[in-house]
Amino acid sequence: MIYLDTSAVAKLVVEEAESSALAQWVDDRSDDVLCTSALTRMELLRAASRRSPDTVPAALAILAQLAIVPLDDLVLEGAATASPTTLRSLDAIHLASATSLLPDRGTVVSYDQRLLDAARGVGLEAVMPGAHD
């Protein structure tokens, strides 16, 4: 399984510097299940609406291809106790969402270094495709 946070999913909707590298990275792993948090739906749709209402359909199309982790009590409790304590609240929710699906294996894709460091800290592979090319 591959967990994409909002910063990664957004690059699949709006062309940014790392978008093509990320799209290729995802295509190369077409047998893997892609997932994200219900939080991403809210963050992505708000960002798409703010950028341009024309991007909302593309955002919805990408979200439809992802398995969505619900924001349930397990995820919220995991976020409340996530380490390091310096991790921002929304990033802690992403980390808890990822670990609820990927307890000891899997990959987190993000363009937030603090989240990637925290994911590595709990034993997950953490990648930022195209960021260091």
Residue ranges and their predicted role:
Residues 8, 14, 46, 94-97, ...:
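Hydrophobic side chains within alpha-helical segments
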Residues 21, 43, 78, 117-118:
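Phosphate- and divalent-cation-binding pockets in alpha/beta enzyme and binding domains
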Residues 64-96:
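Acidic catalytic patch
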Residues 19, 41, 56-59, 76, ...:
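A general structural signal for well-ordered alpha-helical segments in protein cores
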Residues 1-36, 48-60, 124, 132:
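Short, well-structured N-terminal submotif of metal-dependent ribonuclease cores
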Residues 5, 91, 112:
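Acidic active-site catalytic centers that drive phospho-/nucleotidyl reactions
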Residues 1, 37, 41, 69, ...:
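Acidic, PIN/NYN-like endoribonuclease modules and their adjacent C-terminal/linker elements
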